[in-house]
Design a protein with these regions (language model features):
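Beta-strand scaffold of nucleotide-dependent catalytic cores
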Residues: 193, 199-206, 212-220, 228-230, ...
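Intrinsically disordered, low-structural-confidence terminal and linker regions
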Residues: 1-27
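Active-site nucleotide/adenylate-binding loops and adjacent lid/helix of ATP-dependent enzymes
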Residues: 90-201, 206-210
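A long amphipathic alpha-helix within ATP-dependent nucleotide-binding catalytic cores
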Residues: 184, 188-194, 223-304
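Short, solvent-exposed loop/turn segments at secondary-structure junctions
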Residues: 148-150, 185-186, 210, 220-222, ...
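C-terminal active-site "lid" helix and adjoining low-complexity regulatory extension at the edge
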Residues: 8, 257-279, 285, 289-294, ...
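Conserved N-proximal alpha/beta basic substrate-recognition cap immediately N-terminal to
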Residues: 20-136, 284
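Hydrophobic residues embedded in beta-strands of well-ordered beta-sheets
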Residues: 211-212, 245-247, 308-309
Length: 357
């Protein structure tokens, strides 16, 4: 029976290994093609040859090589202190939980699973009548999100003050399978940074059983009137000291520009203390214990006008590697390694070492 059990385990591992090989070579093809185009058409630092070497050893994207971590001027010892997004994805696939991934990926499942931390109205457009839709949008502003959307794409705001054909809009939202959420009124302390967007706090947790550690946190702000605060929409972000809740460093955008004050409003970023920080930490730790096996999570939260900590969304594979490393230009690979060992009892670097071609 022992031999049969071993064979079954081997068979179960083969598809995962083959999948990882496919992922690696797909990344290699895409990343090297993109980098070659960039080096051919832009005035850049480093060289394509050096980038290829960095990819083989660390699986970095062109953006990580050129901007996020500035690999182009680091020696190999310094480069090895950073962990790339692709390396983190290997760790997530190996150590993450499939059921948790499904819940975090599905916006409706997520809102239901974490309802104790959700204080706003929400519904799928198809689950309410036109009459109810019209009553709601005339009562408060609504954010419309594509049910399968990511990175803020396709999101728009429905304002009760707008002159619209509400019936046409309703059937468009139903047909396109949109999720509707009440616009959150944010506390003035955070709203003042950029009033047009909901300026959120990303808190990254690593958990196993009742043991939960806050690995890092960011404060994200919109810019130029955008309703979205992430970097894909031009937003900026600043690292938060998880012990104090204070922003100790300037914010950064996706092109390595730094901001001690907000570029639009002039509000001071560096030195700002996030309100209700201890409550935010407690909320995220409680959320990480709501369902079993949430080993990794990025919690997007805000402080509403009633002083409540509200969870907006969650990410089962948070980009904390870039978020924590990029602003400081300091690698956190060893910190990630030690935290996962302390919390989960597993060495994540052993999982990615086989990809060092």
């Amino acid at each position: 029976m022992g031999v049969v059990y071993k064979e079954k385990n081997i068979m179960r591992l083969i598809p995962m290994f083959l999948r990882e090989i496919c992922v690696y070579f797909n990344e290699k093809k895409q990343f090297l093609r993109d980098a070659h185009n960039k080096f051919s058409h832009e005035i850049v630092h480093g060289s394509y040859k050096d980038y290829v070497d960095a990819f083989k050893k660390h699986r970095v994207t062109y953006s990580e090589y050129m901007y996020s971590y500035e690999y182009w001027h680091l020696n190999e010892e310094e480069r090895d202190e950073f962990i790339s997004t692709s390396e983190m994805q290997v760790i997530y696939r190996k150590l993450g939980n499939k059921k948790v991934r499904e819940i975090f990926h599905d916006k409706v499942q997520f809102l239901n699973a974490f309802s104790p931390f959700i204080h706003r109205w929400w519904s799928l457009a198809k689950n309410i009548s036109y009459e109810e839709f019209k009553r709601i949008v005339l009562q408060f502003d609504v954010i419309a999100k594509p049910i399968d959307g990511t990175r803020g794409k396709g999101i728009f705001k429905i304002s009760s003050s707008e002159d619209k054909d509400w019936k046409e809009l309703y059937y468009q939202l139903v047909g396109d399978d949109y999720l509707l959420e009440q616009c959150i009124l944010e506390t003035d302390e955070l709203k003042e940074f950029h009033p047009a967007s909901l300026n959120t706090i990303r808190v990254v947790t690593i958990s196993c059983g009742d043991h939960c550690e806050v690995f890092g946190a960011l404060f994200r702000m919109g810019t130029h009137g955008s309703i979205i605060d992430n970097t894909h929409a031009g937003g900026i972000f600043a690292p938060i000291n998880v012990e104090t809740g204070i922003i100790d460093f300037p914010a950064i955008d996706g092109r390595n520009n730094y901001y001690s004050v907000h570029p639009d409003t002039g509000k001071q970023i560096k030195g700002f203390c996030i309100p209700k920080w201890e409550k935010i930490v407690v909320t995220c730790k409680e959320a990480s214990r709501t369902i079993p096996n949430i080993y990794f999570a990025g919690w997007d939260v805000c402080i509403n006008s009633n002083g409540q900590v509200e969870i907006i969304e969650g990410n089962h594979a948070p980009d904390f590697d870039g978020g924590m490393q990029a602003p400081l230009k300091k690698g956190v690979k060893r910190k990630i390694q030690q935290t996962i060992i302390d919390v989960m009892g597993k060495d994540p670097l052993k999982l990615i070492s086989i990809w060092k071609y």
